[in-house]
Amino acid sequence: MKISPTLTEVKEIAKTGKYDILPVSCEILSDFITPIEAMRILQNVSTHCYLLESAQANEAWGRYTFLGYDPKLEINCIDGHMKLGKLSVETENPSEYIRQILSEYKSPKFDYLPSFTGGLVGYFSYDYLGYKEKSIRGKARDTEDFKDVDLMLFDKVIAFDNLCQKIILIANMSLDAPETGYNKAIVELKQLRELLMHGEKKQNMGGKLLGEVTPLFEKEQYCDMVEKAKHHIKEGDIFQIVLSNRLSAPFEGSLFDTYRVLRTINPSPYMFYFSGTDVEVAGASPETLVKLENGVLHTFPLAGTRPRGATAEEDKKLEEGLLKDEKELAEHNMLVDLGRNDLGKVSKFGSVKVEKLHSIERYSHVMHIGSTVRGEIREEYDALDAIEAVLPAGTLSGAPKIRACQLIGELEDNKRGIYGGAIGYIDFTGNMDTCIAIRIAYKKNGKVFVRSGAGIVADSDPEKEFQECINKAKASLKALEVSQEVEE
């Protein structure tokens, strides 16, 4: 088993005093196991696990799939009540505590390793904005007690390299005592290898709907919300607002088989499954919230949608029609401007650029108008600042963002929780990759939830917007239904 880096190299890095930890790694062939099988093994030894994978817009599978289990620490906060493992504190600024924890895990980046080598995995809720924007906080009831932020710190990573058909095992070591830490990391790598090769797989990871799926807002209630929103638009209060509806049903068991189905019927750039202390999430999101890599920020606004054509010719005609739709283009341009404004809050002056405008992004069932906005993060800011600057995305709130969020709180009168928030990771190296929490199913308190929204403008038809919410929820609902018939 070849270990990288060598002990000599580790000692040299430790002498610099720049870092607290370092990723030690080895490689094994992956032809004996799949990521799904690996997750079954991890679930058998820990209730706290995650799986992150990707399918690209060109229908190719993403290069890396990341898995982890048994976190070193769980961090969450709800209404200012924060838990850091066993420690409880009251705070108006959870990000400062998260930042303090990350500051104890500074790590070098090695080019031979994948983008994620350990760090925080989980979600920041849509409502996390309330800690920074006090006018939004407390405007909505929370009947399910969803955390405002829920993150787990993983110092061991299993990375499937789908291109090279190998698994990269990573164990982060402390640089306080390099030789002791190095030897401990090697033991952990051997344990990881043994677990994957001989671990027992957990059975019965399916779930069961125990009753009818019911909406938070019936049709009449939702249409009334739309009319109220249109009044605010006509008064010049806002330009656009995204109003959501939540479907729920009694549920028992796991969402893992739901995830297995979702990744086949709706392959997406961001596919994820994780289970924590009191919540389980399965999702396939098409849209990046914000990404930070080596000091460069990206956000990729998606707005404007058409179904995929049955033939290449029909697909091309649908693309041409979408790019000529003035209403779709106007909405998209507004979101591009919002993305530029959001990145500008934490980027170096003059660095924010629209790299790509009005490209067509094709996915399994739909195509979207996509653009790319880039910025270079200022030295005084970090991944947490970038998330706070962008969250929630304009596609989940509206414009102007703050006023739209205030009205969402008043009209929906129900905290959104995970939906519309950020799901992903913050790496020990300072890099970060998060998606918008849409196309998800999540479970808590014996119930499963699916939430979706529609963008409301001045001439919106309330009944059509209600139906759009239902249509957007179909992939997650179908996955829930089909997963009940999945065989082990």
PLM features per residue range, with description:
Residues 1-488:
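Extended alpha-helical targeting/anchoring segments
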